């Protein structure tokens, strides 16, 4: 094969954003809904400020579009290590105006001292469903709250208790709810901790979005020893629905706890069935503020907005800042 033909094939590969996966039967092509990720800003779009509730860190945001604006709920941390959720909104997705006070602060015993962490958002009808981690400095547990305006929240409590799972015998965190029913049920990918102290991804289902049951006896997306996701496999934002399946952005950490971003595709009719998984990360720490902060070498994607021609992803940098990444839609 000539060098010219090889270059042409590589160009077509890059343009179509097609990933080839070798199987025992044949090569199956999976098409991702987006192209190459590019930082929308080389600097943080949200940073810690003041001496109070958001003075140590503002990071790991969830986002939705409401009344023509991008609304962000972000994790804010004070110098004592207590987390709350702040509210900010934007017309362009980059420049945000914050509310002066948090919209969700620790109240229950399961949130005391540690706080409310790492939000994810999904909307059904006129109700917003917020999954978050309740942390009381001893236990981290996956919790739920609902709202009609993203400001006033009704807590539903712990939805997946720690230490009581099928395979996840430790903490539970990071609930990414699929934005449509499948087989008459709601589905949610989550993080659980196995007896060997590794964090892996599980799946749960619900009839009402409040009461959840684990769907499997083993992780649906396990860690991979020796790779970039050898230690942590954690859901990102709400999955993207495509003809290929459920496209799930996830955050993986290696044995040195360097966090990078990757992609998995699950069957749209059977969300337990993994179809594709990144061999390499699609996004990694590069900027100084992604490498130096409260936790070094972290990019952690939790928010996503579909802007029509592209996607805008939001992430935490080094557990201190918020950044944004643009990715064109695949054609």
PLM regions and their residue ranges:
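Bacterial N-terminal signal peptides
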Residues: 14-24
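Short stretches within intrinsically disordered, low-complexity N-terminal or propeptide regions
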Residues: 9, 16-18, 29
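Intrinsic structural disorder/low-complexity segments
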Residues: 11-12, 90
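Beta-rich carbohydrate-recognition and catalytic domains
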Residues: 24-114, 122-231, 240-297, 307-331
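Compositionally biased, intrinsically disordered low-complexity segments enriched
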Residues: 10-11, 79
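N-terminal secretory signal peptides that target proteins for export/translocation
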Residues: 1-9
């Amino acid at each position: 094969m000539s060098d010219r033909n090889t270059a042409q094939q590589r160009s077509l590969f890059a343009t179509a954003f097609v990933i080839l996966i070798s199987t025992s039967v044949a090569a199956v092509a999976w098409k991702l809904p987006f192209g190459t990720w590019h930082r929308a800003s080389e600097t943080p779009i949200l940073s810690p400020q003041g001496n109070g509730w958001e003075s140590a860190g503002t990071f790991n945001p969830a986002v939705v579009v409401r009344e023509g604006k991008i609304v962000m709920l972000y994790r804010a941390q004070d110098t004592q290590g207590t987390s709350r959720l702040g509210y900010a909104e934007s017309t362009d997705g980059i420049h945000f105006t914050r509310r002066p006070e948090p919209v969700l602060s620790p109240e229950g015993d399961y949130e005391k001292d540690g706080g409310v962490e790492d939000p994810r958002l999904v909307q059904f009808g006129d109700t917003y469903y917020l999954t978050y981690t309740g942390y009381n400095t001893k236990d981290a547990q996956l919790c739920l709250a609902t709202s009609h305006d993203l400001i006033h929240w009704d807590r539903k409590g712990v939805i997946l208790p720690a230490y009581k799972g099928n395979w996840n015998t430790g903490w539970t965190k990071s609930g990414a709810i699929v934005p449509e029913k499948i087989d008459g049920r709601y589905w949610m990918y989550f993080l659980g901790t196995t007896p060997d102290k590794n964090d892996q991804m599980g799946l749960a289902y619900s009839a009402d979005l409040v009461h959840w049951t684990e769907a499997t006896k083993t992780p649906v997306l396990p860690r991979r020893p020796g790779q970039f996701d050898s230690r942590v496999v954690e859901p990102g934002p709400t999955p993207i629905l495509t003809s290929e399946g459920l496209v799930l952005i996830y955050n993986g950490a290696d044995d040195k706890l360097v966090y990078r971003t990757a992609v998995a595709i699950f069957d749209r009719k059977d969300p337990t069935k993994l179809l594709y998984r990144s061999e390499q990360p699609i996004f990694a720490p590069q900027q100084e503020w992604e490498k130096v902060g409260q936790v070094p070498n972290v990019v952690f994607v939790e928010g996503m907005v579909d802007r029509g021609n592209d996607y805008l992803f939001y992430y935490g940098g080094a557990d201190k800042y918020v950044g944004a990444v643009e990715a064109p839609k695949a054609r």
